[in-house]
Curated annotation (Swiss-Prot):
The keyword Nucleus does not apply. HAMAP family: MQO (MF_00212). GO terms for biological process: tricarboxylic acid cycle. This is Probable malate:quinone oxidoreductase. It comes from Exiguobacterium sp. (strain ATCC BAA-1283 / AT1b). It catalyses: (S)-malate + a quinone = a quinol + oxaloacetate. It comes from the Bacteria. Belongs to the MQO family. Its EC number is 1.1.5.4.
Length: 499
């Protein structure tokens, strides 16, 4: 097995949406830097970013009830919802910039307008939804959201969900037309097409075997060319690990102090996919329900209109599965290999504390097709077993770490881990993930390149006009940006968004 050695400015591990976004930011800010990308698979965006491996929701907290929690006094805390929405607005602005500059074309291939709805049943839940609407609509980011508990109005909005519904239990839904369906696989491929045409070296079929820091502070990455069965050694002063579920083992190999006391717990997602075109055409929205009491946030059920390869699809889920793999294409030894002396206490503490999650996963794994269909019928009463089939989506590795709240705390979100000197950063976690990619990668730049920020800031503000500001505190700017990005991205948003 022969070996070669080369040096570059930036190494990106993984050809998913995160590396594609960071690479695109670098190309705009420092076009002269040399960038190399290493991807184990044969194409870009094939793991978590692939359109069949995630929900495709442009997460802006318009419909996801887990981002708005109820306080003890009955008030609704919308801070997390505002935060997620702000982050999605940053992504919209950057994507619109790339389209305007002609760096990516045909935005309709990766983003479409689709109403985002929250639907609940039962008196208590309807009351919660009404209070949630009141709280959200005090904020300009959620202007245009409306609620109805009138069955005839709901029949217009969501006929597939209302047809055959015999229960007299109260039901209500909120609706906002500025929601989006995002094909992150298509977007990832577009971004890498742009990058490779501008000198970025993208290496498929290259597996990163080891990572180590050199005496000069640079990073040495040992890469196996799987087609040639050769080992290559590449060095760079900056390394980004964006390998989805595969990021944690590579972060551990860096040996940086920040990688200690961090573990990962893999959860696979499954969706029911509709095979009946007549049924698919009856629904046009992303409708999110409320997680059952005691169920984790990842379990929020939703019925989604999707656009994949230009074709309308209908998916319901997620259902959870379990495999010890950290990637769909990973190894059954991934979980056990990730347990190290520095995180074993963290992992054991999480195991002891997260019994409800363990119980939930066991119940989910044991679900039959009939049982999954019963859950779907809570959304679509007339759903027929033969119209739906199960597909296995991507692996989500939930971060486990020690926090002020205690050891072994399970984190639901997306997290950047970087070294103190800013020479290496890794992206861990799950939802809202890809929707907030631009915000998260700007955070990487802030943490790892503080010395460059003063010179980069004018260009960043050109790409993301609201950079450094909270749009929720600048309603006029939000309205201007939201309308201009909608036009550039070809989003057909109704006038009610800003009435």
């Amino acid at each position: 097995m022969s070996s070669t050695q080369t040096r570059t400015d930036v190494i990106l591990i993984g050809a998913g949406i995160m590396s594609a976004t960071l690479g695109s930011l670098f190309k705009e800010l420092v076009p002269e830097w040399n960038i190399k990308v290493f991807e184990k698979l044969d194409a870009a965006g094939e793991e978590s970013s692939n359109e069949w491996n995630n929900a495709g929701t442009g997460h802006a907290a318009l419909c996801e009830l887990n981002y708005t929690t109820e306080n003890a006094d009955g008030t609704i805390d919308i801070s997390k919802a505002v935060n997620v929405n702000e982050q999605f607005q940053i992504s919209r602005q950057f994507w619109a910039h790339l389209v305007k500059q002609g760096l990516i074309e045909n935005p309709g291939a990766f983003i479409r307008s689709i109403p985002h709805m929250s639907m609940v049943q039962g008196e208590k839940n309807v009351d919660f939804l009404k209070r949630r609407l009141e709280a959200l609509t005090t904020n300009p980011l959620f202007e245009g959201m409306v609620l109805s508990d009138d069955p005839s109005q709901l029949q217009e909005w969501i006929p597939l969900i209302m047809d055959g519904r015999t229960s007299d239990e109260p039901i209500a839904a909120t609706k906002i037309d500025s929601g989006t369906d995002v094909n992150f696989g298509a977007l990832t491929r577009m971004l890498f097409d742009h990058l490779t045409s501008n000198g970025v070296e993208l290496n498929y079929g290259h597996s990163v075997e080891d990572v180590k820091r050199l005496e000069n502070g640079h990073w040495e990455v040992k890469v196996k060319d799987m087609s040639q069965n050769t080992i290559e050694t590449h060095t760079a002063p900056f390394l980004f690990i964006g390998g989805g579920g595969g990021s944690l083992p590579l972060l551990q190999k860096t040996g940086i102090p920040e990688s200690k006391q961090i573990g990962g717990f893999p959860v696979s997602g499954l969706f029911l996919v509709c095979k009946n075109r007549e049924v698919i055409e009856q629904h046009h929205a992303k409708v999110y329900g409320k997680a059952k009491v005691g169920a984790p946030p990842m379990s929020v059920p939703h019925l989604d209109t999707r656009f994949i390869d230009g074709r309308k699809e209908l998916l319901f889920g997620p259902f959870a599965g379990f495999t010890p793999k950290f990637l769909k294409t990973g190894s059954n030894l991934d979980l056990i290999r990730s347990v190290k002396p520095n995180n074993v206490i963290t992992m054991l503490a999480a195991g002891a504390k997260e019994m409800p999650l363990t119980k939930y996963l066991i119940e989910q794994v044991l679900l039959s097709h009939d049982k999954r269909m019963d859950e779907l019928r809570e959304f679509i009463p007339n759903a027929k077993n033969e119209d739906w089939e199960i597909v296995v989506a991507g692996q989500r590795v939930q971060v486990i770490k020690d926090t002020p709240q205690g050891k072994g705390t399970l984190q639901f979100g997306t997290e950047v881990v970087s070294s103190e000197d800013g020479s290496v950063a890794a992206l861990l976690g799950a939802s809202p993930g890809a929707s907030t990619a631009v915000h998260v990668m700007l955070k990487v730049l802030e943490q790892c390149f503080p010395q460059h920020l003063p010179e980069w800031e004018p260009k960043i503000k050109e790409m993301v006009p609201s950079y450094g500001l909270k749009l929720s505190e600048h309603p006029d700017l939000f309205k201007t940006i939201h309308e201009s990005t909608a036009i550039t991205l070809g989003l057909e948003e109704k006038d009610m968004v800003h009435n």
